[in-house]
C-alpha cells in the first residue's frame, strides 16, 4: 500500500477506530468465550465489546492455525479490514531455545547472535508472529538485578554490536521477506540502572553517564532499523519513562531519529499513577500521548480516555493521528494489507521448529558462550577415569531461562542424556544430590507451579547416594547453580550466592573427594569465592538452552575448546555491586602495592572483582605481543593502526578474543580508566600465530563534553590490547 493510501485510510477512520489501533490486548481476550471475556477480564479492565473487536494488536497468541483464525475473526469485524499485529516475547528462541542473552554476550560474536535471531524469526514468523520484543539492550552493572540475564552485559560498545546484529537477524533487509519479524528494542531507557538492583525501581543517572554508557546500544539498534521501541517501567531522574517527553520526543525521536512504533511495557502507562506522577488514568493517557507513545499494552488507559480528552479539548487529535499512522505504516511494511497472515503456515511451523539446522546452531552458540573461569589441569576430562556427575543440574531439563516460555523444557538435552552417549557406563555414575533450592525458598514463575518440596527422607536419600558416588569416583563433576526462576523479571536478589542447599552438598562432596569440577548454571554473576577457592575447575555455562547438555559434554571432554569471555564482571562479593571495569578515575586511586589509609578502597575486600569483564580461559594458552602503532600522532581526519601478534603457545587448537581498550589520558571531564573499542575472535592451531590489527579513528575517542556535545579533545591516548579488561599491554599516541 502506498503512503498516500495509508493517509487516506487514516482520514476515513473514526476517532474511536484510531484510538483502538493504539490498544494491545493479550490472547486470553480472544481465545475464550466472548461473553465470559466481556463479563470477566475485559470488564475488570474497562474494555468494551468495540474495543475488543477493534484492538490493533495482540500479545502472546501464536501458532499458525490459531493466528489465522484470530486474524479472520478480527478482519471480518473490522470496517476497514485493517489486519491485526501479533506480538510476543521471543527473547532467545521460539521453540529452539538459544543461550540466554547474557550467555550470548560471552561469545563476543555478534554475528553468531544474529544467526540465532534469524533462526528464531523463522520459527516465530511461521507461527504467525509479526513482532518480537527483542533484543533487550539495557546496560547492566548490578548482579542483584534479575534481568541482567536478558542483556549482553556491562559494556556499551559490546552491547551496541549485539544490538545491531540481533535487530538485523530478526528483520533482515525487508520486513516483507519470508521468515522475518519486526524487532522491538527495549527498555527505553536506563532500566538496567535500577537503584540497588531492585526491579522496577527508580533510576537516577547523570546526563553524562546516561548518554555515554546507557544510550549507545539503543542508538545502535535504531540505526540498524529496529521497527519498534518499548518504554521502560522506571523513572528517569524523576519522570516515568512512558510519560517522559524529553526522553521519548527529544532524544528518541529527535536526536536518534526513530520514526517507528513506540509501545509501552505491560501496563507501564497506568503505573505512572502509582508513581504519583499522573493524577489518574486520564492524566496518564494525556501525558503518554504527548510523549509520543503509540501503543498502550494491556490497559484501558488510552481506550477509555483519549476520545473523551479530544472531545473536551484536552488533547489534540493530530497526536492520535500520528500514533495511528505509525501503526498502520508498520503493518504496511510487514506486508499485512496484502497478506494478513504473512508467513503463518502450520506445515512450515512444524518443519522449522527444532529442526536439525537450528539445533546445531543452538549447540554451537552454547559452546561458544561457555567461560572457563578456573582450571587446575583437570579439564578436559580423562574419560578413562571414574567420573561421578553429582548435582541438581545433572539431569535437569530446566536450562533455558525463565524468559523462554515459547519453548518446552522437555526438548532440552540434559548433561546426563548427553554424557550417557559418550562416557563408559561402567565408569560413570549420576546423582542429583539435592534439589536446586531448599524447601525454605519460595519462587513464583509466570505460569509455572512453585518448585517441588522434598521430605527429609527424600533429601537424605539423595545426599547419601551422591556422597557414595563421590567416594567411588576419581573425579566429580558438579552441575549446580541458580534456579531458573531466580533470574529474569522480578527476581532481584540481595544475596547472589549459589543456593545454600547446593553449597552444603558441595562441601560434603569435597570432604570425600577433593577433585571437583563445577559446571555453573545461572542467569547473573554469582558470589563464587568459596567455589573458586576449593573447586579444581569452574565452567560457566549460564542457561544454555535446548542443546545445553550436549554442548557441556563436548566442552568437558575437549571435543570443543571453551572460548567465552565474561560480558559482565563477577563481583568479589555482593557488597561491590554495582561493579564494572570501565569505572571513572578517582582523585585517590588505590594502586597496586599501596598500603595507605586515605585511598578509595574497602577495608575488608579488594576493589577488583573476582573475575573481571573480558576474562576467560582456554585449554590452550595464548601470548599477545607488545602493541605496535603505525604512527604516534593522528589528526582528526586520520586513523592509527594498532597491531599485535597473537600466538597459540599451547598444545590444543583454540579461539582467543583479542580486546582493544583505550584510555583518554587527560580531558576536561573525568573519563573511564579504560573503554572497550574493539574485539576480534581468532582461531589458532598449536604454534600458529596471527597478526591482529585495529584501526582507531577520532570517532573512537569521542565523549560527552561539558558543552553537551559529543566530540574529542587533543591530547594523548593509551591503547591497550589483551585478552581481558585487566590488560596493561599498551602504547601511546597523540591526537592533534
Map each language-model feature to its residues.
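Flexible, membrane-facing loop/turn or short amphipathic-helix motifs
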Residues: 705-707
Amino acid at each position: 500500500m502506498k503512503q498516500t493510501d495509508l493517509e487516506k485510510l487514516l482520514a476515513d477512520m473514526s476517532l474511536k477506530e484510531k484510538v483502538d489501533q493504539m490498544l494491545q490486548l493479550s490472547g486470553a481476550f480472544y481465545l475464550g468465550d466472548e461473553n465470559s471475556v466481556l463479563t470477566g477480564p475485559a470488564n475488570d479492565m474497562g474494555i468494551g465489546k468495540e474495543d475488543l473487536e477493534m484492538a490493533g494488536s495482540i500479545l502472546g497468541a501464536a501458532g499458525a492455525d490459531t493466528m489465522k483464525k484470530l486474524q479472520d475473526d478480527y478482519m471480518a469485524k473490522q470496517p476497514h479490514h485493517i489486519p491485526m499485529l501479533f506480538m510476543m516475547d521471543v527473547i532467545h528462541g521460539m521453540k529452539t531455545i538459544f543461550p540466554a542473552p547474557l550467555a550470548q554476550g560471552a561469545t563476543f560474536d555478534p554475528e553468531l547472535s544474529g544467526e540465532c535471531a534469524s533462526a528464531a524469526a523463522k520459527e516465530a514468523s511461521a507461527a504467525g508472529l509479526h513482532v518480537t520484543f527483542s533484543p533487550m539492550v539495557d546496560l547492566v552493572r548490578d548482579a542483584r538485578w534479575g534481568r541482567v540475564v536478558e542483556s549482553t552485559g556491562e559494556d556499551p560498545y559490546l552491547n551496541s554490536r549485539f544490538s545491531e546484529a540481533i535487530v538485523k537477524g530478526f528483520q533482515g533487509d525487508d520486513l516483507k521477506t519470508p521468515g522475518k519479524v519486526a524487532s522491538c528494542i527495549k527498555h527505553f531507557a536506563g532500566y538496567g540502572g535500577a537503584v540497588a538492583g531492585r526491579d522496577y525501581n527508580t533510576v537516577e543517572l547523570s546526563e553524562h553517564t546516561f548518554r555515554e554508557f546507557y544510550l549507545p546500544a539503543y542508538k545502535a539498534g535504531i540505526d540498524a532499523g529496529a521497527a519498534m521501541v518499548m518504554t521502560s517501567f522506571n523513572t528517569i531522574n524523576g519522570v516515568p519513562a512512558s510519560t517522559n517527553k524529553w526522553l521519548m520526543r527529544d532524544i528518541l525521536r529527535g536526536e536518534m531519529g526513530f520514526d517507528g512504533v513506540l509501545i509501552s511495557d505491560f501496563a507501564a502507562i497506568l503505573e505512572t499513577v502509582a508513581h504519583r506522577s499522573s493524577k489518574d488514568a486520564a492524566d496518564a493517557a494525556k501525558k503518554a500521548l504527548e510523549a509520543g507513545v503509540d501503543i498502550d499494552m494491556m490497559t484501558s488507559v488510552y481506550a477509555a480516555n483519549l476520545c473523551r480528552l479530544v472531545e473536551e479539548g484536552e488533547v489534540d487529535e493530530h497526536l492520535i493521528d500520528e500514533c495511528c499512522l505509525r501503526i498502520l505504516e508498520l503493518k504496511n511494511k510487514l506486508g499485512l494489507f496484502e497478506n494478513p497472515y504473512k508467513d503463518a503456515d502450520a506445515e512450515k511451523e512444524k518443519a522449522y521448529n527444532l529442526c536439525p539446522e537450528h539445533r546445531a546452531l543452538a549447540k554451537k552458540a552454547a559452546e561458544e558462550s561457555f567461560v572457563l573461569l578456573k582450571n587446575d589441569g583437570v579439564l578436559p576430562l580423562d574419560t578413562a577415569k571414574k567420573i561421578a556427575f553429582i548435582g541438581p543440574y545433572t539431569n535437569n531439563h530446566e536450562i533455558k531461562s525463565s524468559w523462554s516460555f515459547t519453548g518446552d523444557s522437555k526438548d532440552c538435552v540434559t548433561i546426563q542424556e548427553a554424557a550417557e552417549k559418550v562416557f563408559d557406563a561402567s565408569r560413570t555414575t549420576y546423582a542429583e544430590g539435592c534439589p536446586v533450592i531448599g524447601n525454605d525458598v519460595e519462587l513464583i514463575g509466570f505460569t509455572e507451579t512453585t518448585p517441588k518440596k522434598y521430605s527429609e527422607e527424600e533429601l537424605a536419600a539423595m545426599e547419601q547416594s551422591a556422597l557414595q558416588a563421590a567416594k567411588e569416583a576419581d573425579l566429580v563433576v558438579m552441575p549446580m547453580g541458580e534456579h531458573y526462576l531466580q533470574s529474569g523479571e522480578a527476581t532481584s536478589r540481595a544475596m547472589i550466592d549459589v543456593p545454600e542447599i547446593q553449597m552444603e552438598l558441595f562441601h560434603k562432596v569435597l570432604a570425600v573427594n577433593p577433585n571437583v569440577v563445577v559446571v555453573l548454571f545461572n542467569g547473573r554473576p554469582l558470589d563464587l569465592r568459596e567455589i573458586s577457592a576449593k573447586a579444581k575447575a569452574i565452567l560457566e555455562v549460564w542457561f544454555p538452552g535446548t542443546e545445553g547438555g550436549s554442548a557441556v559434554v563436548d566442552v568437558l571432554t575437549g571435543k570443543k575448546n571453551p572460548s567465552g569471555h565474561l560480558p559482565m564482571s563477577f563481583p568479589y562479593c555482593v557488597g561491590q555491586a554495582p561493579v564494572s571495569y570501565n569505572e571513572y578515575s578517582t582523585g585517590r586511586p588505590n594502586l597496586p602495592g599501596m598500603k595507605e589509609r586515605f585511598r578509595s578502597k574497602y577495608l575488608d575486600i579488594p576493589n577488583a572483582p573476582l573475575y573481571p569483564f573480558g576474562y576467560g580461559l582456554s585449554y590452550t594458552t595464548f601470548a599477545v605481543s607488545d602493541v605496535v602503532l603505525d604512527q604516534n600522532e593522528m589528526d582528526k581526519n586520520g586513523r592509527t593502526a594498532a597491531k599485535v601478534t597473537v600466538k597459540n603457545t599451547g598444545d590444543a587448537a583454540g579461539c582467543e578474543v583479542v580486546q582493544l581498550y583505550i584510555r583518554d589520558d587527560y580531558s576536561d571531564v573525568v573519563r573511564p580508566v579504560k573503554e572497550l573499542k574493539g574485539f576480534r575472535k581468532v582461531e589458532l592451531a598449536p604454534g600458529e600465530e596471527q597478526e591482529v590489527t585495529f584501526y582507531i579513528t577520532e570517532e573512537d575517542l569521542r565523549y560527552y563534553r561539558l558543552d553537551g556535545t559529543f566530540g574529542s579533545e587533543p591530547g594523548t591516548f593509551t591503547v591497550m590490547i589483551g585478552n581481558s579488561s585487566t590488560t596493561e599491554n599498551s602504547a601511546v599516541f597523540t591526537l592533534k
